């Protein structure tokens, strides 16, 4: 479908937008862009990793992020009123969605500050009147430590406020020699919730709400950045929006796939066994461990959801409503992702493992104690369906016929990058199958660097292969090589920032 509607006449609306889009660029808009880049690319990720490291510095960083976001929003508002009406992008969602996200940003900040204040107040209640030397405990460790023994209800201490709770006297610990610890309701028996003070429940709910929103805000910032680029460049108008959505959604998925893969290589999510490591025994024995999906299950589900949601998207961009061979190519690709993702989900499912073992279990007269080999030994999964799906996506899109040379070359380049990423991932599986990891520390197979690099670079070039973007490349007489160079540089910047943020997390955790 790319390039099918190319218009070489001088009144091409895309060409007019491209030549005049600089009219948008006043000093207030530039200030808005700079503020948002600093806030979303540097400050927000730093605040997230500091919060994950339980550092007290994450609150000041979060305040700086909110202030920068507010200043950037004000600059954007001024810029909009100074722009001439003919430069408005009618029907854009960047401004209304940005306004909504601004309020959510304030909500996140309020929740974070409230949680911090509430935690400090409750910690004071749990400090004995006369502290013994060396009795002080790190507040965050106190919050993390669970005073519930096997879900036993908490009982108030005699002679003290009813807000101070201790384990029942039947506990084997000598509670008289300890200061009361702060209960955690993360993974305890639900029946014991009624015996926990309501303020503890409120604190834990606020903490998890703040943590979840903080992680989601990375993707929100990326979404707003993409809509801002679309607004500034004047692309994806009218029926072209469907072609733009199809390419940018797909490209963004592969781009974030690569970012997460590189994070796993560096050691992120190692507590779940996602860093090509053995799941730590202390965590695998916890009650919640059996509910944590494998990395391959998450990847398969994302491919499945992506395939289901993108079957008809390219066809909707047709002005005549008729099916052509480009529509069939895109629909068949979506069906492949749909069913390949479903195969990956089924292969990774513990329920399916039990059913597949049912015949042997009946013959032996016993059931396996665990659902799968990798869960039994704490080893990573060797489900290759996600890698195969990415490989064939790259191979097929490399052969995706286009109506102009620039679009054809760009499709070939990012298709080969995705295929290379899949091959590198399969090499990772082969190496780990021949020599499985034996330590809870991240294995860091070198092939995962290639996988991550090719996914990020391929995803960026995927987004650049949409119809309107290719037209702008041609109108400005740029070559596919330049787009490749920009994508490679962008990939190196992203991976470098990711390393620095995880270094910051490790440094904060060590302190």
Curated annotation (Swiss-Prot):
Transmembrane spans: 33-53, 59-79, 97-117, 216-236, 249-269, 297-317, 332-352, 412-432, 449-469, 483-503
Disulfide bonds: none
Signal sequence extent: none
Pfam families: DUF2427, Ytp1
Keyword terms, alphabetized: Endoplasmic reticulum, Membrane, Phosphoprotein, Transmembrane, Transmembrane helix
Localization: Endoplasmic reticulum membrane
Protein name: Uncharacterized membrane protein C3B8.06
Species of the source: Schizosaccharomyces pombe (strain 972 / ATCC 24843) (Fission yeast)
Taxonomic classification: Eukaryota, Fungi, Dikarya, Ascomycota, Taphrinomycotina
């Amino acid at each position: 479908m790319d390039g099918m509607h190319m218009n070489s006449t001088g009144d091409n609306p895309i060409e007019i937008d491209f030549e005049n889009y600089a009219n948008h660029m006043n000093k207030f808009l530039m200030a808005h862009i700079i503020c948002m880049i600093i806030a979303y690319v540097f400050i927000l990720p730093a605040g997230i990793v500091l919060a994950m490291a339980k550092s007290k510095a994450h609150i000041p960083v979060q305040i700086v992020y909110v202030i920068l976001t507010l200043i950037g929003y004000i600059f954007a508002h001024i810029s909009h009123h100074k722009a001439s009406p003919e430069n408005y992008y009618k029907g854009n969602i960047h401004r209304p969605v940005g306004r909504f996200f601004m309020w959510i940003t304030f909500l996140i900040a309020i929740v974070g500050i409230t949680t911090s204040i509430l935690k400090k107040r409750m910690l004071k209640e749990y400090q004995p009147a006369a502290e013994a030397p060396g009795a002080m405990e790190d507040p965050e460790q106190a919050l993390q430590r669970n005073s519930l023994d096997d879900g036993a209800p908490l009982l108030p201490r005699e002679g003290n406020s009813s807000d101070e709770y201790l384990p029942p006297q039947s506990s084997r610990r000598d509670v008289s020699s300890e200061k009361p610890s702060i209960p955690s309701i993360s993974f305890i028996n639900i029946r014991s919730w009624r015996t926990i003070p309501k303020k503890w429940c409120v604190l834990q709910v606020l903490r998890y709400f703040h943590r979840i929103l903080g992680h989601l805000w990375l993707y929100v910032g990326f979404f707003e950045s993409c809509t801002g680029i679309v607004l500034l460049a004047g692309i994806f108008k009218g029926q072209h929006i469907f072609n733009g959505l199809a390419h940018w959604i797909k490209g963004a998925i592969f781009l974030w796939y690569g970012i997460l893969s590189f994070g796993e290589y560096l050691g992120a999510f190692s507590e779940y066994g996602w860093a090509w490591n053995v799941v730590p025994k202390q965590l695998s024995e916890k009650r919640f461990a059996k509910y944590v999906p494998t990395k391959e299950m998450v990847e398969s589900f994302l491919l499945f959801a992506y395939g289901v949601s993108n079957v008809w998207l390219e066809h909707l961009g047709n002005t005549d409503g008729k099916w052509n061979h480009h529509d069939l190519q895109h629909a068949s690709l979506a069906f492949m992702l749909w069913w390949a993702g479903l195969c990956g989900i089924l292969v990774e499912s513990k329920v399916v493992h039990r059913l597949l073992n049912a015949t042997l279990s009946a013959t032996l007269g016993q059931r396996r104690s665990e659902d799968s080999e990798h869960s039994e030994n704490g080893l990573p999964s060797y489900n290759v369906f996600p890698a195969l799906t990415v490989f064939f996506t790259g191979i097929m899109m490399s052969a995706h016929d286009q109506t102009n040379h620039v679009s054809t070359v760009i499709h070939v380049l990012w298709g080969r990058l995705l295929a290379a990423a899949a091959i590198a991932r399969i090499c990772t599986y082969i190496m780990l199958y021949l020599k499985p990891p034996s330590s809870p520390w991240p294995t860091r197979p070198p092939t995962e660097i290639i996988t991550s690099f090719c996914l990020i670079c391929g995803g960026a070039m995927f987004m650049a292969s949409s119809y309107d973007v290719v037209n702008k490349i041609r109108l400005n007489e740029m070559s596919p090589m330049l787009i490749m160079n920009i994508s490679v540089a962008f990939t190196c910047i992203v991976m470098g920032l990711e390393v620095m943020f995880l270094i910051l997390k490790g440094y904060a955790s060590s302190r």
